[in-house]
Curated annotation (Swiss-Prot):
GO terms for cellular component: membrane. This is Pecanex-like protein 4. Glycans are attached at N523, N848, N915, N1132, N1159. It comes from Xenopus laevis. InterPro entries: Pecanex, Pecanex_C. The chain crosses the membrane at residues 40-60, 73-93, 141-161, 166-186, 218-238, 244-264, 305-325, 366-386, 391-411, 455-475, 502-522, 573-593. Its main location: membrane. It holds the Pfam family Pecanex_C. The keyword Lipid metabolism does not apply.
Amino acid sequence: MGPDVPLLNEYKQEFFWKRFPQTVLGGPRFKLGYSAPPYIYINQAILFLIPWLLGGAGTVLGEVKVLQDYYTAVFSGGLMLIAAFIIQLLNLYARKKTSTVERLQNQNTLTDEDEYDFNSCLGSETIKFVIPGKKFIANTIFHSLVAGVLCGLGTWYLLPYRLNLLYGNIGGTVMIFIFGWLTICIGEYSLIVNSATETATFHAQDTYEITALLRPAYIFAFIAVDLADRFIVTVPALQLANQVLHVVFLFLPFLWALGILPPLDALVLWGMEQTLEFVLGGSPMSSNLRVLILFIISAATTISAYFIPNSVGLVLFIAGLGFILSLDLTEMCIVLKHHLKRLSPFMKSTSPASLHWQLSWKEPTVYFVILLLILLEASLLHYFAYSAFSISSAQAIVSYCLIILLVSLWILKEMQGAYILGIIRNPFFQSDIRMLNDFMKKQSRLRKVAVARRILLTLVSPFAMVAYLSLDTSLYNLHSASVCIGFTRAYRTIWQNTENALFEMVIVSIVQLLVFNTSVWWNVSLDTGIRLLLIAFIRDRLCQLVSKLQFAITVLLTSWTEKKQRRKSSTSLITVNIIFFPFVLSFVILSAVLSSPLLALFTLPVFLVGFPRPVRSWPGAVGASACFCTDTVYYQQMVPGLVAALQSAFASGSLGLVTPGSHFLCRFQDRLIWLLVLERGYTYCCVNIKGLELQETSCHTAEARRVDEVFEMAFEQAESAGIFALNHHFGNIMTPCTVVPVRLYSDARNVLSGIIDSHENLRQFRDDFIKVLLWVLINSCYRNSKSHKSMDVDENEENMPAPSKTQAQTGSDPIAGNPDELKAAENIHEDFDEWSDDDIFEILPRTNKTGIRPIVAFTGDKLSIPGCVEMKHVDNSVEQDIAVDKLYSVVGFGFPAIDKGKQTLTEHFNMVPFNSSYSRFLRIPQDWIFVSLPQLKLNEMKQMFPRDWYEFIFTQLDFHHLNEKPSTVQDELSKDSCLQDQFIQGLSSIYFAFFGMENLVPSSAWLFRAYLGGMPWSVSLDWLTGRPELFQLALKAFRYTFKLMVDKSSLGQVEDFKELINYLEEYDNDWYIGLASDMEWQQAVLQEKPYLFSLGHDPNMGVYTGRVLTLQEQLVQIGKLNAEAVRGQWANLSWELLYATNDDEERYSIQAHPILLRNLTVQAADPPLGYPIYSSVPLHVPLY
């Protein structure tokens, strides 16, 4: 698609310009897509201005001194409450008056497109359109009460005399009064009439009608400041804030329309997350529940610290709890619960999931020892070694050590990655990764460096920082809120995020060393804990500012430099950005200060400030939804190995500074894995892993190719580029970091047309199929014998007398019995494939046939249908006799039965007189033999039967489970002619079901269809498919034979039976040979079968393809993404799909952008906006 594709198609543009004015005004629909009477617009205007009219009445009474200001507020609020209830009652009346089933308003596209037939100004349809009503009765009452309170407080907030006192300017008072009431009317309309669709949308569905409270909540926040200023008159800063906020109050409609102010649910989560991180010293969490629990516990810890009366007790309390709260307590409790379930006999035994932290007794022991050392160090240093800060004090000496540690850790970290600062090639990093063994050997030196870094980071640095804090004299200022907040946070951050805490403490130490003997506010007004808090906030916002500036510059430049991103408007947009650079920069700074995404509208250089939201960016539970498909299984298999590999990568520092909100992209062959860091603590990290689609679209392919180029330049072509080569893809949002070994499946596809089309291979295929099928049948019977040997043999069968020679000839097997009967049977099967053995007279009820039952064969001189053998079941003798009588009555024979009164001779299949007593353990089930097979085909199979191969198979089996000498058992079984005849019958039943009665040389197309299980229909095939177990064995043998044909063509012919056995045993043990669409294929992947093979056909090229998956350790490439670029594109996606509803399949924002990786970023978003095919639950990765 060209670069001039419309951002919104014609239909969506019209839709947008109807929706946006509604958003600005808070809900009134003054622009419709169809003709409407004027009173529709007049009614909405009246409802919109009702709060102003009622508030104006109270304002007049207050200004003329009839009522006091607070009575004025009560008066206006009461009127508004009555009006709100009247409006809602009108809606209820209209809904009851109509007989049609009413569907209440949903915030979706269809609601905006519904058409109404209006009859009158106050008709039912008019009322229902103008006043849609609430979903819940509780909301009807609650929203009306809120509307009344809002109108009353709004009247008080905008009283002219009060405004004149604030500003002392009549013109300013008039402006604020007019536009202030416009803001209140916009907020009231969503409460009493109809809420607007907000550009700031967090949840896709507004189930509980929270959106209606969004605008009133912000109005209440402004009014709260004014009320505080009214009752607290001694705070000049509060009065100044009130004056400023009255002016900002006028611009609330624009802030709502631009989506800068967050929805209430996002605001609460964002507020808790920011407070937990910067005030309480914690980390963003992987779920809303964890955020809430940790927020409450951390806040309780900080409050409790305020009441501790002793400084040593304070140090012990905040130092100990700071360490404990930084541990992964939730995951430890989950693992402990699993262990208790496994050990307790009264609880259901369940083993821990493979993705859970495999916790042993060592970790709690180490943590307990560390806790004791922390308490001992902190208390002793605070009690015995504290002193005022000076250049030579103990705290200053510790600060020097901290500086050395920070520099050392930074150097050791940069040595681990592919690039230094993401720009210069790291000379210590291995330049070529194509040979796994060589790469791992050469990386061993860096692994030793990583161990040293890990020790410094997890043990040395935290204890050094504990010493620094414990020596601070500010801890003696008991019952101080700043000390409790600052030092509780500081002791917690040491363990929660050691690298950031070390950097912040070094900055504070350097500043302290420079200004310790001066009287600047840094020294006088702030204690060490608050200094650390401020530095942490500044550090975080500066890092975000740099990332956002990089993202903005990339969007600006690529809108011109990338040919496919260049639009007709690109020049104008770039010019506007240059001219209004201060405003653009202020937008970037504002988004950094608010920690909100910088939204590039449609990924164009049109920058807006998105609303603040949690680090996870999405409201739903992590990993709760994904677009699952057959390819999902490959990500499920590789995730445990990838988590283990990430453990060492995170701990070594090769992935750079890992903080909550960091994004990484992993690449291996056609797989793209998206990593999001959710939380970070002491020796653990919580991540979410997403798998992107494997069926590559054109846009996906373009970006995946660029990803491959970036990784190849970093890991495969670095040697030719030079030791200190520059990163030529520095502007890309992805920076290559490292490679990690992961045990996963490599995917290889080969063209098999030359093999499957070979006439020699096709002729040999039938003989190989007989051998493979024979091996499969014998092994199946052998396994059954091992599983059933432990069971006692049926007593009746044990005590049964040996049959006579006559019985053996007539009853041992119906097919191998009387030759005359076989010839007669053969005559009726000359046109075998066109007959059915169903009950054509429908005398007996039809049942599902699960096997061949024992039959009654009528012998002697009797009349019957010529050439047929009459049979009947003996399961129910009475029913069968009636059935036989009915049969003769239908046919209409007139001769009397000469054998009437004689006992019917019954013969059972299990009375085969095997020559060996062990043959019964390996016999074929009788329902695996097609009794109607012509004798001619049996004779044909006897000629093709590989007797040497048959005997060789028995020599390879272990018969110790039969409690005899294996050699004796093997010899007896191989010489048992009855057993051999039975296997010949089984082979014939399957072979001719596959290849047909003609037994022609198969074609390549037939071979492909048969591999898929789509053989041409025949009676024998119908019989075979009616026995699922046998059919699966036959299909397995067929596929093994096909794989054998491929291996013989590529590796050479099979020299002897031993080699053939080795091939088949390898197929059986290490391979899954089938179809990639089979459920068994997915199970084999999850069970980690070493090899998988499938056959396919490319209709475009007209060739047959073979696909082989090989499980082995491979190197997965990992790159770090610009987190702000990802958040910005996700924010734009949310705006575009949830507000503009731009569901066009070819919309501009999912087109390929090789620099910003726009298509891949959209895929990685949570459904319904994105479409990852796999998304894991939060995975806890230990970092030790």
